[in-house]
Amino acid sequence: MFNWKSKCSTRSLLTTVAGAKSDDSEFESVDAPLEPQTWEGSFLCGLLKNQPQVLPVAAAKQLQELSTQRKDTLIRWEHSIGSPEDILHRRIAEMKEQECQTAIEDIMYTLIVYKFFKIEVPLVPNLSKLISNRRLQIWPPRETELESIHGPEVLGLIREHLTSIIRWVHRNGPKINCSTLRIKRLQFSRIYSASIMYGYFLKSVTTRHRLELILAQSQEFCPPIQFLNAQFNSTQKQEQEEAIGGSTEISSSSKPSSVVDLHDLKSYMMGFDPKTLELCARLRSCEASNLIEKHSWALFRENMKDFLEPDEAVILDPSSLKRLLLEAIAFGSFLWDVEDYVDEIYKLHDS
């Protein structure tokens, strides 16, 4: 349903290569792993296919309409409290809330897919469509495009994450050869979901870091009121001591504090206390949590049979694993942006 239209011609949004070997693989057009469940999602899918340039405006309008519908329903319920229609309007409000949440999640997912569209990277579809004889290969890797959305410091952290994951799979999986990995399907899905969370976490950290740098720079030119008060009290004390012939030395505690040290991102992150670390890692909304679960489920499991066979192993090369992990990290970063944008228009549920 989520299809892609390039600048020059109409193409499938999701074009991947599946097969045991790159030379006998063939391209195929497939849908995104998660299909829309609401009219709003289906409508945006059509725009993404035929008129992607108008999708952001259409999504914003849908968000406004859903916000208005939810408010109107709640107002009718509040007005009916104490009347015979109280229970009816409460039930209507609950149903409307559920409908709106599903529609909001569809809109958020489409906006994430649109962000992948803008960097010309197709989302990997359900892996069952790409696996042949338990072997998965994804080509091209799209490494350059997926890395292009991150700054140099973040990219360094991401590469450390990728290296640690690949080494872990090598160390814990059955030994085949140095260029082939084998991982259980359930483990694979957990690593993918964890990488989405890592991308979300990195986006949260970089945003917080940037804001603190701006604050530190502003304080350098415009000292905070606490510092000005300390300066004033220090001056008063000095004048009093001079008036009675006392010492004119200013205590070290009253001297101007040094400007906040502008750490690099990794040093800044390593300095987090447990509370700050938890705050940055925690998903802000239930909708974001639901999307990660739904997207991962749609990618790794086609039906209940797949879920009941978690020990099924997947064979793949390091480049295919790296492709999926980079996609997951980008998904988490895009999710943070989309969640922040949507929450400004339609208040999401706190997680």
Where are these regions (language model features)?
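Long compositionally biased, domain-poor regions of proteins
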Residues: 21-351
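N-terminal chloroplast transit peptides
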Residues: 1-24
